[in-house]
Design a protein with these regions (language model features):
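A sensor for short, sequence-defined functional sites
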Residues: 1-171
Length: 171
């Protein structure tokens, strides 16, 4: 996971105020919120010195979820993991949008977004995919949202998502 632009600025300040253990705990919470029952198995946050702005922020982490698959009579359903719902300025700003009708514009002062790619290696343990969610593409003046899911060679389930808030003011 990389933090760039406004996310770099915001999260760099946040991470610089945390101890290494508190940083790990932050990502443990993200994993638990994103994949209930998930356990963080590996973690690395770079750069070690958050004041080193010559390097972008990169979080590398692995996690495990036991009994994650939902078995059915003839099929198995896999809940998808979406880290974009738990990290990033766009997520924070969307959470504040909540009105159906606005008397005054919602000013964010920034355009921002998140790009997510998640790979789950299942090999041939689950058999052939019977169905996948349809790809989504919404693109208008204020926002872009694209999502897709596919199965690639060797039994890798790939989920890709891009969300962009393209303007700093919404009416």
């Amino acid at each position: 996971m990389f933090f760039e632009g406004i996310n770099d600025n915001t999260y760099r300040r946040f991470f610089s105020q945390l101890t290494p253990e508190e940083r790990r705990q932050y990502f443990e919470k993200i994993v638990m919120r994103t994949a209930p029952g998930g356990i963080l198995t590996s973690f690395d946050l770079l750069p070690a010195d958050m004041l080193d702005t010559s390097q972008r922020i990169e979080a590398r982490f692995g996690f495990e979820v036991r009994e994650w698959a939902i078995p059915g009579k003839d099929t198995v359903m896999l809940p998808m993991v979406h880290f974009a719902k738990s990290v990033g300025m766009s997520n924070i700003l969307i959470g504040k949008m909540g009105l159906k009708k606005r008397k005054y514009p919602y000013v964010t002062n920034v355009a921002c977004g998140i790009q997510e790619s998640f790979r789950l290696d299942v090999g041939d343990s689950l058999g052939k995919a019977l169905s996948l969610p349809e790809s989504t593409r919404i693109d208008n003046k204020g926002a872009t949202w694209k999502s897709s899911m596919s199965v690639r060679g060797g039994g890798s389930l790939i989920f890709e998502q891009t969300f962009k808030m393209k303007i700093p003011e919404y009416t």
